[in-house]
């Protein structure tokens, strides 16, 4: 049985993330979506909110587990007995950082492979940062996130005194 880990902040989880989950879950026996605490990134949504959102969007995949983690990815990979780390590459600009991380992970986890996946064409330009910015400025994010995520974004932006839907 091959277990893979797909780590990320998922702030928020986008259609691009779900696209990679759908495709990776068809390759591996188990795909663990690791929602990183990432306090240093100052996430828009709390860890608990991001876990709830991920479970709402991904809960229908029978071989996908959503879990949070803090600390080093290598420890999360080991705890889950994963043999593969799945990473998404949207553009060439992602490659340098992801290449460096893959090298470090190979050093820390010599028996674990990193697999890069590109999103489907219609999702290559989507990022959580851009989606948050559009939502905070009152724009339509419905093509980039699922309806439940759009609702979370609207409620959060409104609670922060931003545009109402």
UniProtKB/Swiss-Prot annotation:
<feature type="binding site">
    <location>
        <position position="87"/>
    </location>
    <ligand>
        <name>substrate</name>
    </ligand>
</feature>
<feature type="binding site">
    <location>
        <position position="17"/>
    </location>
    <ligand>
        <name>ATP</name>
    </ligand>
</feature>
<feature type="binding site">
    <location>
        <begin position="123"/>
        <end position="129"/>
    </location>
    <ligand>
        <name>ATP</name>
    </ligand>
</feature>
<comment type="similarity">
    <text>Belongs to the bacterial CoaD family.</text>
</comment>
<feature type="binding site">
    <location>
        <position position="73"/>
    </location>
    <ligand>
        <name>substrate</name>
    </ligand>
</feature>
<feature type="binding site">
    <location>
        <position position="9"/>
    </location>
    <ligand>
        <name>substrate</name>
    </ligand>
</feature>
<dbReference type="GO" id="GO:0005737">
    <property type="term" value="C:cytoplasm"/>
</dbReference>
<dbReference type="InterPro" id="IPR014729">
    <property type="entry name" value="Rossmann-like_a/b/a_fold"/>
</dbReference>
<keyword id="KW-0548">Nucleotidyltransferase</keyword>
<feature type="binding site">
    <location>
        <begin position="88"/>
        <end position="90"/>
    </location>
    <ligand>
        <name>ATP</name>
    </ligand>
</feature>
<dbReference type="InterPro" id="IPR004821">
    <property type="entry name" value="Cyt_trans-like"/>
</dbReference>
<keyword id="KW-0067">ATP-binding</keyword>
<feature type="binding site">
    <location>
        <begin position="9"/>
        <end position="10"/>
    </location>
    <ligand>
        <name>ATP</name>
    </ligand>
</feature>
<dbReference type="GO" id="GO:0005524">
    <property type="term" value="F:ATP binding"/>
</dbReference>
<comment type="function">
    <text>Reversibly transfers an adenylyl group from ATP to 4'-phosphopantetheine, yielding dephospho-CoA (dPCoA) and pyrophosphate.</text>
</comment>
<keyword id="KW-0460">Magnesium</keyword>
<feature type="binding site">
    <location>
        <position position="41"/>
    </location>
    <ligand>
        <name>substrate</name>
    </ligand>
</feature>
<keyword id="KW-0963">Cytoplasm</keyword>
<protein>
    <recommendedName>
        <fullName>Phosphopantetheine adenylyltransferase</fullName>
        <ecNumber>2.7.7.3</ecNumber>
    </recommendedName>
</protein>
<dbReference type="GO" id="GO:0004595">
    <property type="term" value="F:pantetheine-phosphate adenylyltransferase activity"/>
</dbReference>
<feature type="binding site">
    <location>
        <position position="98"/>
    </location>
    <ligand>
        <name>ATP</name>
    </ligand>
</feature>
<comment type="pathway">
    <text>Cofactor biosynthesis; coenzyme A biosynthesis; CoA from (R)-pantothenate: step 4/5.</text>
</comment>
<dbReference type="InterPro" id="IPR001980">
    <property type="entry name" value="PPAT"/>
</dbReference>
<dbReference type="GO" id="GO:0015937">
    <property type="term" value="P:coenzyme A biosynthetic process"/>
</dbReference>
<comment type="subunit">
    <text>Homohexamer.</text>
</comment>
<feature type="site" description="Transition state stabilizer">
    <location>
        <position position="17"/>
    </location>
</feature>
<dbReference type="Pfam" id="PF01467">
    <property type="entry name" value="CTP_transf_like"/>
</dbReference>
<keyword id="KW-0808">Transferase</keyword>
<keyword id="KW-0547">Nucleotide-binding</keyword>
<keyword id="KW-0173">Coenzyme A biosynthesis</keyword>
